[in-house]
From Swiss-Prot:
Belongs to the aconitase/IPM isomerase family. Pathway: Carbohydrate metabolism; tricarboxylic acid cycle; isocitrate from oxaloacetate: step 2/2. Its EC number is 4.2.1.3. Monomer. Binds to mitochondrial DNA (mtDNA) and identified as component of mitochondrial nucleoids. Changing residue 604 to K: Strongly diminishes the catalytic activity towards both known substrates, aconitate and homoaconitate. This is Aconitate hydratase, mitochondrial. PROSITE patterns: ACONITASE_1, ACONITASE_2. The modification Phosphoserine is found at residues 391, 556. NCBIfam families: aconitase_mito, PRK07229.1. InterPro entries: Acnase/IPM_dHydase_lsu_aba_1/3 (IPR015931), Acoase/IPM_deHydtase_lsu_aba (IPR001030), Aconitase/3IPM_dehydase_swvl (IPR015928), Aconitase/IPM_isomerase (IPR050926), Aconitase_4Fe-4S_BS (IPR018136), Aconitase_4Fe-4S_dom (IPR036008), Aconitase_dom2 (IPR015932), Aconitase_mito-like (IPR006248). Transmembrane segments: none annotated.
Length: 778
C-alpha cells in the first residue's frame, strides 16, 4: 500500500504527451492509495458497444458513462426519463455525517467487507467558532465517539478513512479518486463536483450506498440530458461560478430534476478542472442528477499536477470512443450561455435560483428592502476552495492592501483540503488573507452546512452575508431566519468584504483608499495550478489494515450519538385508512426543513435522537407556524416530532402533505428514516426532489404525487386520509386517496408514483435493507 501522500509532491507537467508503454489493455490503478482498484475502460467500451448495437444512435458523453456501467447491457430497457437503469459504480464516497447511518445499515446486513472501494471523509462535524486549529481540536474531543466508530468500522470492513482535518469530501475526491469516465456515488448531494474531471458523480442516500457496498447493482432512473452549450471566453470579474448561478436563474431549483447536465461547446476548454468542478458541484441546486464536462486538456493538467499522469495518459487512449460525446449526439433540451457577455451574479436570498447580475443588484436590493450592509463574507467550501479560487481572491486582497484597506466585514476562509491549506500557506495566500483581517477556518464544511457558532448578531436580527457556498436556504448557515444569505464567486465575495455594501459593483464602482483617493479594484487574477506543485501537508489518511480479523466495532447501548438499527416492520398487506395528517407543509420544504443540520449533526448516528428534529423547520399551512401542529385526537398543539410520536405510540399511521419539489437540497437519508421511525406511512406532494423520493422508497414509505396539483389546496389539516388499492400497487398504476373531511362528504383524489417492481418489493418488505437481508438468506 502506498503512503497516503507520497506520490503527490511532484512538479506540474503540462502537455499531452502519452506514456509510450501504455496500451488499451494496460492495468492502471484508479488512484495512488489503493493497490487493487483498476480502471475498467476496456470493459466499459465493450459494454457500451453492446448497447450501441441495440440502440443504433449517437450517444452523449453522460450516456457513454452510464451505459458503459450497465449491469445487464443485453437486457436493460433504456428510455431516457422512463427506464430504471441497473448500474455498477466504480466506487462510493461517504462524509462522516451520512456515513454513520450507511455503515450501521451495512453492519446490519451481516456482510464481512465492502464489495467496492469505499472511503469515509470527516468534514461535517467540525464547528466553526474561533479558527482552524482550535476548532479542529474541539471537534475531535466532542466527536471522539463517532470518529472512533468510523475509524474502526472502516478498518473492519475494508474502507479508506480520511481523518478530521483532511478536508471536504469533494475536494479530497477530486484530488485523489476522480478520473474521467468513472461512475461514483456519494452520500452527499454535492458529489457531482467530480464532474470537473469528466466523471459521473451522483449524490445518493445511505441506503443506495449500501447497495453498492454489498455488491448489488445500483438503480437510477435513466436521466434525460440537458445540454449546456458554452461559447466564447470569460474575462474580467466573471468566473466559473457565474455560469451555474446564471443557469440556476434560468432553470430554477427543480429545472434539472431527472436530468444530467452535460456541458459542451468551445467554451468548455477555457476553464481549469477545478473551475469545471465548481460548475458541476452547484448543479445540485437545480435538482440535477449530476453534471459533467467532457475529457479535455485541463483535466490532463490537473491529473498530472496531483500525481496521476498515468491515468491521464491512459484516458487519452479512450478519448474518442469513451470520453467524449459522439458527433450529432442529441440532448433533450439545450441552454446556450455566451461567456463573452456573461457578467458576475449574486444569487439569493433564501434560495439559490434567485439570480441577479451584479449590474442590477443595487436597484434590486433597494427595491426588496434587503439589508445593504454586508456583515460577513465567507470564501471556501466544497464549491469554491481550489488553489485558483484562493489565488484569485488573494489578488483582490493584495490590491486593496496596496491602497491601505482591510476587510470591512468579518471575513472567513475555508480551505477545501489539507493539501490546499498547506499549499496556500507555502505560497503566501494564507498570510495575505490573515493580514486582510481574515479568519482561517478548519479544512471542513463549517458555516456552509450550519456548523457555525456565530456571535456577531442575535437570532432574529436582520442582516446580510455573502458567501462562495452553494446553498442559502432560510436559517441554513447560522440558524437565524432573518439572515439574508447570498451566494457568489469567491472573487465577488472578497470585493463585497472590502466595500461592506451589497450595492457595490466592482466593474463600475470606485472605492476610497486610506487617504481618501478614489480607485477601482483590478480584475482578479491567479494561477489555476500552483507553479511549484502541491504541498500535501499533513498525512491524514488511514488505509484499512491487511489483517482485519481483530478489529472490533463497538456501539455502546447508552450512547446518545450512535444507535444500532432495528429492522422496520414489513407492510401488513392492508390498505391504510383513517390516517391523520401530521402536517400540511406549505412552500419550500427542503431537507433542511425536514431534518435540520447544524446542531443536529451530532445525532446523525442515533435515529431515535435525530428524529426529534423531524419537520421542525417546515411551515404548517394551518397556522403558518414552524414546529406547531395539532393532534387531531386531542386538539393539543405540540411540536411535529412529539405529535408524530403520540400517533405512533398509539399504533396510528400518519401522512404528510407537501408542496412542490419536496425534499430539495441535501442527500441526507435521515429526512426519510425519521418519518419511518416515527410511524409515517405516506408522503403526498405536488412533486419530489429526486434523492429524497428515492430515500423514502428505500425506507419502506410511499412517496406519492397529486395527479391534479389543485387537490393539494382542497385538503385541510383536520382531514383523514385513506390510501386504497395497495394490494394492486404496480408500476405506472395510480392509487386512490380518499379524503374524509371533518365536516363534509368524502372525496377521492388520484395519486401517481414512480415505483418500479423492485421498489414495490422494498415497500412490501418494509425497507430496501430488509429485502437485501432476505435475499442474502436465499
Amino acid at each position: 500500500m502506498l503512503s497516503a501522500r507520497s506520490a503527490i509532491k511532484r512538479p506540474i507537467v503540462r502537455g499531452l504527451a502519452t506514456v509510450s508503454n501504455l496500451t488499451r489493455d494496460s492495468k492502471v490503478n484508479q488512484n495512488l492509495l489503493e493497490d487493487h482498484s483498476f480502471i475498467n475502460y476496456k470493459q466499459n467500451v465493450e459494454t457500451l458497444d453492446i448497447v450501441r448495437k441495440r440502440l443504433n444512435r449517437p450517444f452523449t458523453y453522460a450516456e457513454k458513462i452510464l451505459y458503459g456501467h450497465l449491469d445487464d447491457p443485453h437486457g436493460q430497457d433504456i428510455q431516457r426519463g422512463v427506464s430504471y437503469l441497473k448500474l455498477r459504480p466504480d466506487r462510493v464516497a461517504c462524509q462522516d455525517a451520512t456515513a454513520q447511518m450507511a455503515i450501521l445499515q451495512f453492519m446490519s446486513a451481516g456482510l464481512p467487507q465492502v464489495a467496492k472501494p469505499v472511503t469515509v471523509h470527516c468534514d461535517h462535524l467540525i464547528q466553526a467558532q474561533v479558527g482552524g486549529e482550535k476548532d479542529l481540536k474541539r471537534a475531535i474531543d466532542l466527536n471522539k465517539e463517532v470518529y472512533d466508530f468510523l475509524a474502526s468500522a472502516t478498518a473492519k470492513y475494508n474502507m479508506g478513512f480520511w481523518k478530521p482535518g483532511s478536508g471536504i469530501i469533494h475536494q479530497i475526491v477530486l484530488e485523489n479518486y476522480a478520473f474521467p469516465g468513472a461512475l461514483i456515488i456519494g452520500t452527499d448531494s454535492h458529489t457531482p463536483n467530480a464532474g470537473g474531471l469528466g466523471q459521473l458523480a451522483i449524490g445518493v442516500g445511505g441506503a443506495d450506498a449500501v447497495d453498492v457496498m454489498a455488491g448489488r447493482p445500483w438503480e437510477l432512473k435513466a436521466p434525460k440530458i440537458l445540454g449546456v452549450k458554452l461559447t466564447g471566453k470569460m474575462n474580467g470579474w466573471t468566473s466559473p461560478k457565474d455560469i451555474i448561478l446564471k443557469l440556476a436563474g434560468i432553470t430554477t431549483v427543480k429545472g434539472g430534476t431527472g436530468k444530467i447536465v452535460e456541458y459542451f461547446g468551445d467554451g468548455v476548454d477555457t476553464f481549469s478542472a477545478t473551475g469545471m468542478g465548481t460548475i458541476c458541484n452547484m448543479g445540485a441546486e437545480i435538482g440535477a442528477t449530476t453534471s459533467v464536462f467532457p475529457f479535455n486538456k485541463s483535466m490532463i493538467e490537473y491529473l498530472e499536477a496531483t500525481g496521476r499522469g498515468k491515468i491521464a495518459d491512459f484516458a487519452k487512449l479512450y478519448h474518442k470512443d469513451l470520453l467524449s460525446a459522439d458527433k450529432d449526439a442529441e440532448y433533450d433540451e439545450v441552454v446556450e450561455i455566451d461567456l463573452n457577455t456573461l457578467e458576475p451574479y449574486i444569487n439569493g436570498p433564501f434560495t439559490p435560483d434567485l439570480a441577479t447580475p451584479v449590474s442590477k443588484m443595487k436597484e434590486v436590493a433597494v427595491a426588496n428592502n434587503w439589508p445593504l450592509d454586508v456583515r460577513v463574507g465567507l470564501i471556501g467550501s466544497c464549491t469554491n476552495s481550489s488553489y485558483e479560487d484562493m489565488s484569485r481572491s488573494a489578488s483582490i486582497v493584495k490590491d486593496a492592501a496596496a491602497h491601505g484597506l482591510k476587510s470591512k466585514t468579518i471575513f472567513t476562509v475555508t480551505p477545501g483540503s489539507e493539501q490546499i491549506r498547506a499549499t496556500i500557506e507555502r505560497d503566501g495566500q494564507l498570510e495575505t488573507f490573515k493580514e486582510f483581517g481574515g479568519i482561517v477556518l478548519a479544512n471542513a464544511c463549517g458555516p456552509c452546512i450550519g456548523q457555525w457558532d456565530r456571535r456577531d448578531i442575535k437570532k432574529g436580527d436582520k442582516n446580510t452575508i455573502v458567501s462562495s457556498y452553494n446553498r442559502n436556504f432560510t436559517s441554513r448557515n447560522d440558524g437565524n431566519p432573518q439572515t439574508h444569505a447570498f451566494v457568489a464567486s469567491p472573487e465577488l465575495v472578497t470585493a463585497f468584504a472590502i466595500a461592506g455594501d451589497l450595492r457595490f459593483n466592482p466593474l463600475t464602482d470606485k472605492l476610497k483608499d486610506k487617504d481618501g483617493n478614489e480607485f477601482m479594484l483590478k480584475p482578479p487574477h491567479g494561477d489555476g495550478l500552483p507553479q511549484r506543485g502541491y504541498d500535501a501537508g499533513e498525512n491524514t489518511y488511514q488505509a484499512p489494515p491487511a489483517d482485519r480479523s481483530t478489529v472490533e466495532v463497538k456501539v455502546s447501548p447508552t450512547s446518545d450519538r450512535l444507535q444500532l438499527l432495528k429492522p422496520f416492520k414489513p407492510w401488513d398487506g392492508k390498505d391504510a385508512k383513517d390516517m391523520p395528517i401530521l402536517i400540511k407543509a406549505v412552500g419550500k420544504t427542503t431537507t433542511d426543513h425536514i431534518s435540520m443540520a447544524g446542531p443536529w449533526l451530532k445525532y446523525r448516528g442515533h435515529l431515535e435522537n435525530i428524529s426529534n428534529n423531524y419537520m421542525i423547520g417546515a411551515i404548517n399551512a394551518e397556522n403558518k407556524k414552524a414546529n406547531c401542529v395539532k393532534n387531531v385526537y386531542t386538539g393539543e398543539y405540540k411540536g411535529v416530532p412529539d405529535t408524530a410520536r403520540d400517533y405512533r405510540d398509539q399504533g396510528i399511521k400518519w401522512v404528510v402533505i407537501g408542496d412542490e419539489n419536496f425534499g430539495e437540497g441535501s442527500s441526507r437519508e435521515h429526512a426519510a428514516l425519521e418519518p419511518r421511525f416515527l410511524g409515517g406511512f405516506a408522503i403526498i406532494t405536488k412533486s419530489f426532489a429526486r434523492i429524497h423520493e428515492t430515500n423514502l422508497k428505500k425506507q419502506g414509505l410511499l412517496p406519492l404525487n397529486f395527479k391534479n396539483p389543485a387537490d393539494y389546496d382542497k385538503i385541510n389539516p383536520d382531514d383523514r386520509i385513506d390510501i386504497l388499492g395497495l394490494a394492486e400497487l404496480a408500476p405506472g398504476k395510480p392509487v386512490t386517496m380518499r379524503v374524509h373531511p371533518k365536516n363534509g362528504k368524502p372525496w377521492d383524489a388520484v395519486l401517481t408514483h414512480t415505483f418500479n417492481d423492485e421498489q414495490i418489493e422494498w415497500f412490501k418488505y418494509g425497507s430496501a435493507l430488509n429485502k437485501i437481508k432476505a435475499d442474502e438468506k436465499k
